[in-house]
């Protein structure tokens, strides 16, 4: 995993510059051992995006950690020095995005938005419509938005 990450990162830096690299990752199927996550942390990764529901596995997190993740909107593994954030808004699954946005805003949770490439190809209009709703709502908000 680390070798692949370093190779991809090297090429991305060559093409786009180091400042454009993501500091939060979403690993395939949310798989990553504590050891592997620690190695990525040493490469500059600050955190990881988790599954949209507590029922799904997310990396090495146990039930107590997942409970904190979903009740607080984030989980910080202080020992390892990495953060975990739920992927609250999965564009291809959202039917009522406004309701979920209201919930996140009231709770003051980070707004994490995600979609798969295949979903854009399957229903481009729905995906972009959902993204527009999120961006419009965020632009209307008066609180400061932090980008990772």
Name every feature range the model reports, one short phrase each.
Residues 11-21, 137-144:
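A structural motif corresponding to the C-terminal end of an alpha-helix
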Residues 46-53, 107, 111-148:
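C-terminal domain-boundary segment and adjacent tail
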Residues 1, 33, 147-148:
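Helix N-cap and loop-to-helix transition residues
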Residues 19-112, 125:
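Active-site-adjacent pocket scaffolds in enzyme catalytic domains
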Residues 1-11, 93-100, 125-138:
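Well-ordered, non-membrane alpha-helical segments in soluble/globular domains
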């Amino acid at each position: 995993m680390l070798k692949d990450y370093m190779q991809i990162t090297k090429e991305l830096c060559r093409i786009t510059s180091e400042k454009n690299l993501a500091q939060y990752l979403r690993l395939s199927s949310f798989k990553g051992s504590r050891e592997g996550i620690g190695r990525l942390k040493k490469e500059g990764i600050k955190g990881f995006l988790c599954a949209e529901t507590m029922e799904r596995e997310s990396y090495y997190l146990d039930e107590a950690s997942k409970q904190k993740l979903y009740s607080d909107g984030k989980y910080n593994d202080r020992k390892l020095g990495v953060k975990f954030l739920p992927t609250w808004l999965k564009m291809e699954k959202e039917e009522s995005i406004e309701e979920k946005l209201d919930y996140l805003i009231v709770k003051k949770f980070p707004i994490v938005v995600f979609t798969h490439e295949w979903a854009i190809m399957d229903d481009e209009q729905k995906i972009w419509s959902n993204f527009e709703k999120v961006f419009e709502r965020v632009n209307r908000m008066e609180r400061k938005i932090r980008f990772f």
